Amino acid sequence: KYGNALFIMLNTQDTNVAEHKQFIEQTVAANKDCKWRIVTLHQDIYGSAEHSNEPEITNLRYQLTPIFEQNDIDAVLTGHDHAYSRSKMLLGGTKANDYTDNEFDAELEKDMDAGENPTTKTVAPGNIKNDSTDEKDQKYLAYLKSIMDEKAIETVKKQGSSVINPEGVLYMTAGSSSGSKYYDLVPRQQTYIAHRWQEDVPTYSVVDV
């Protein structure tokens, strides 16, 4: 707890979501005076770099987001992909397509291979095209479309550059502060992303409460 903000840290290397649910509910109930509720976890469940679309990550997304929404969480701060992104306000995302990690990994490597002379160092090329006749490619593209969560995007009221009392949850992925590792942004920016940025330089984020 800091001022009128409640920070809830989840260890999502522990995959027991029932325990996370219980911990969040108990913590919120014990701190009803807090105006803001902020969760932090490692995996970027609504990120935009190369790990963000992994089935392992999106499966975690659809297990955790209903819990966040039920407990009126305002923002979720994540990492893992070492590339900055900020989501739109999201509410009610639903899983629509099953896909295995093995299937995904093979297609991702093919899709994001920049070769020996990449045209960009921060955004992957997107080698798999919409008109591909390969069945595996089409299954991969269908999976990517299913996790864009377009229907979860909330309409917001703005006052200047500020969003006023929005519905839904904001998800932010931090870049790398140490500069030890960077990941490329995926070639197809997800519909749920409001802004993303990667220039392979150390960055940090500040939250004012």
Question: Model-predicted segments: where are they?
Answer:
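Serine-hydrolase catalytic core recognition
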Residues: 1
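Short histidine/acidic/glycine/proline-rich micro-motifs that form metal-
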Residues: 14
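Long, structured stretches of catalytic cores involved in phosphate-ester chemistry, encompassing
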Residues: 4-6, 17-22, 31-208
